[in-house]
Amino acid sequence: MKTLYSLRRFYHVETLFNGTLSLAGRDQETTGFAWWAGNARLINLSGKLLGAHVAHAGLIVFWAGAMNLFEVAHFVPEKPMYEQGLILLPHLATLGWGVGPGGEVIDTFPYFVSGVLHLISSAVLGFGGIYHALLGPETLEESFPFFGYVWKDRNKMTTILGIHLILLGIGAFLLVFKALYFGGVYDTWAPGGGDVRKITNLTLSPSVIFGYLLKSPFGGEGWIVSVDDLEDIIGGHVWLGSICILGGIWHILTKPFAWARRALVWSGEAYLSYSLGALSVFGFIACCFVWFNNTAYPSEFYGPTGPEASQAQAFTFLVRDQRLGANVGSAQGPTGLGKYLMRSPTGEVIFGGETMRFWDLRAPWLEPLRGPNGLDLSRLKKDIQPWQERRSAEYMTHAPLGSLNSVGGVATEINAVNYVSPRSWLATSHFVLGFFLFVGHLWHAGRARAAAAGFEKGIDRDFEPVLSMTPLN
């Protein structure tokens, strides 16, 4: 086993630019990497790489704490969260902290506590990162073999994978415990317009939970993004947490099978590429979730979804014109279809007009008006509550549209306001990050496969055109 632990610091990949610049005593000659290649110099220095990762975690947690406190400092309780450009407080509110019926914020102290806790823990991580980057041992293999590793040691790598899976499983169960025992979470579907409640009757049926994975991603199906009750979400986290923990134990106790040893590339850069690929998938899924799902991301905090704002507009004008005497059941629109109501391809009664394309929207302010065959005409005439009118009017004017210069709303609207929905920001940012992570996955996967095949040499420097040109200066 000891033969794996090599103190060789040179990792043979050709690098660009000059090697004369020495940074922190690590120049290109000793490490095989130029200054700009950053942590690549630490590939075989497990102690220093630990420092880089812990310091990075410290930066992440510091951002979370500082941004959290910034949002608390700027928060105005009289305005909805989505009008204030907030992206962290909506997550805390969704977890049931500081909010009451209808998503109204009744206490900002839990948000303050969250920010301070993150700041304090970021200081601990920052200290640990600096310690391991500058003072701690360069390599962990000799002094702390449990924390040491060599990238090609397949058994150790799957053990580390197992530990990570167990930690992810514990994270999933933290949400379950919050929903079950520690005050509950915010349920946008609670009667009368949403409230915080404990989730007692979990959905644990595998046919339901895994049925989401087998659904089509299109239209009214919507794959896992179509989940619309908290029992399914929390039950899904029970399943996910259990699978992650059991899978983690499995990977700690077992060694990779022969087919896995043959199929995968076993190097640091290969693991980096696998991780980037996984993060890319997470980014794309998160993008779709925050854009379409108003249960995991309640509209009270994140603003309405696109389809929701569109349906809200149709509903608002149906209410107005019905009050003015229109017969909404039979009024004909300019196309010959129903002006307010029409039938979907499968026969349900739906809102007419341009919003017909969003007919499969489900939203808590609208569902009480549906019957067995779609929207119920008698309920539309008799049962519309003031809170439904208020909420749809609010959502109609806060569609998740907007440009980078923060002039929100429909581009042709002359009375545009400075409003960009957090859904727009979160969906766009996660799509862009997911894309770049995917490109990074392809890049590092290509390099890792080439290195494993033995032809990672970069460009042949002997015949590079620039060598025969006169210096720029």
From Swiss-Prot:
Q: What is its main location?
A: plastid
Tell me the keywords, alphabetical order: Acetylation, Chlorophyll, Chloroplast, Chromophore, Manganese, Membrane, Metal-binding, Phosphoprotein, Photosynthesis, Photosystem II, Plastid, Thylakoid, Transmembrane, Transmembrane helix
> Which Pfam families has this protein been placed in?
PSII
Indicate where this protein resides in the cell.
Plastid, Chloroplast thylakoid membrane
Q: How does the protein's chain sit in the membrane according to the entry? A: Multi-pass membrane protein
Q: How is the cofactor bound?
A: Binds multiple chlorophylls and provides some of the ligands for the Ca-4Mn-5O cluster of the oxygen-evolving complex. It may also provide a ligand for a Cl- that is required for oxygen evolution. PSII binds additional chlorophylls, carotenoids and specific lipids.
Residues recorded as bearing N-acetylthreonine in the entry = 15
* Annotated TM spans: 69-93, 134-155, 178-200, 255-275, 291-312, 447-471
A GO biological process held by the record: photosynthetic electron transport in photosystem II
Sites of the modification Phosphothreonine? 15
Q: Name one GO cellular component term.
A: chloroplast thylakoid membrane
Which residues belong to the propeptide? 1-14
Family listed: Belongs to the PsbB/PsbC family. PsbC subfamily.
The cross-references to NCBIfam families, in alphabetical order and at most eight, read: psbC (TIGR01153)
Q: What does this protein do?
A: One of the components of the core complex of photosystem II (PSII). It binds chlorophyll and helps catalyze the primary light-induced photochemical processes of PSII. PSII is a light-driven water:plastoquinone oxidoreductase, using light energy to abstract electrons from H(2)O, generating O(2) and a proton gradient subsequently used for ATP formation.
Q: How does the annotation summarize its subunit structure?
A: PSII is composed of 1 copy each of membrane proteins PsbA, PsbB, PsbC, PsbD, PsbE, PsbF, PsbH, PsbI, PsbJ, PsbK, PsbL, PsbM, PsbT, PsbX, PsbY, PsbZ, Psb30/Ycf12, at least 3 peripheral proteins of the oxygen-evolving complex and a large number of cofactors. It forms dimeric complexes.
Stated name of the protein:
Photosystem II CP43 reaction center protein
Lineage of source species? Eukaryota, Viridiplantae, Streptophyta, Embryophyta, Tracheophyta
